[in-house]
């Protein structure tokens, strides 16, 4: 990243954190532009008249909007908005998931931004503590009027780290789902209907029994030893609201103990489904269970179209209800048509979502419970009503609150977790070591964030 442009981000809580963590990528200096300074939060001020309403826009307005997204296909939805604003041209640019975060941040740094960005929750922590993005609680957006129309956890996950600004407006939220081969469960005498299998796998001994039985014939329920721990990770974030590490607990002791059994009994396939050999294993049925978001069914169909009717979906093993991700709109402060851009965001979240989202679960609670969506079936999944399952699961899970420290913490966690399992370390000792390493490695960043949070408190 270039110093000359990254200085312009005008960081709030995370200025010094990133300066330390990125070894000088963010330089200090005078005369730098403070992006979004003109849009400081007014949430502490008395609401102005009409502050609970959104600014009206002339439907005949002639304008252009640009939307940046991290997946393909959104352009097909644009005609819905253009029915309301026929003279508005909307250009959609999609980016590769692997690189979009850096490109979006660089655009915010340069001030060369689109009108709207769509950001995945996995990277949201990078955007939640910087200037250059609008506080959607402020006029003319007044998004606070919708707070009760979202789950409390999802709303909190879209707030800034100090909980004073609403940085994102969520479009959808996805649980993590178990995908499994029904025919293989039938063949080996295990429960094969979605509810029955989900209930059976709630007991870890039952899941391990399945894994041991199927492994004898070269069939696997997990790709690698620590994969099962990922399902537990989807239920609890690294840090609490006080930035204290919160994964050194009984839940993760159980997760690691299961992963250690998988390692000791060689129950993992040691294949990655995102490789050619992994895809082949999916096609052959060597991998009979996977854990993905609600998009997983389409992905399996792409890998193994000939397996139509053989796959089903159910809840996670071990009685877990985990969150995969959410898609969140953010509004760059340097956008040229911010009021219209907010109308665009508001429309897709609170109106268009009521008509169904191609199997995704709307973040907006009034858009859920659509009878047509609930009754829809997926032919590839043996005509299973998978959307109804997705809504059931999303209502039982809780979204997690991201922090700017999560990526660094995850790198330490993943490495030490894999090493600890491989070396057969005592579980409690392993977790103590991971906590100590994360807390000590990120001590400077944690201290800076805590001090800034204290200073921002009323």
Question: Could you tell me what each predicted segment is?
Answer:
Residues 327-407, 418, 429:
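Mature extracytoplasmic/periplasmic domains
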Residues 39-43, 394-458:
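Conserved C-terminal helix/tail region of periplasmic/extracytoplasmic solute-binding proteins
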Residues 56-72, 88-93, 116, 167:
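Short, well-ordered beta-strand elements
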Residues 83-150, 188, 288-289, 367:
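Extracytoplasmic "Venus flytrap"/periplasmic binding protein-like
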Residues 98-101, 219-227, 235-316, 339, ...:
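Extracytoplasmic ligand-binding clamshell segments of periplasmic binding protein
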Residues 1-63, 444-458:
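Short, low-complexity disordered leader/linker segments with a strong preference
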Residues 46-53, 121-177, 205, 310-314:
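Hinge/lid segment of periplasmic solute-binding proteins
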Residues 83, 160-227, 242-270, 333, ...:
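Helix-loop-helix "hinge/cap" segment bordering the ligand-binding cleft or interdomain interface
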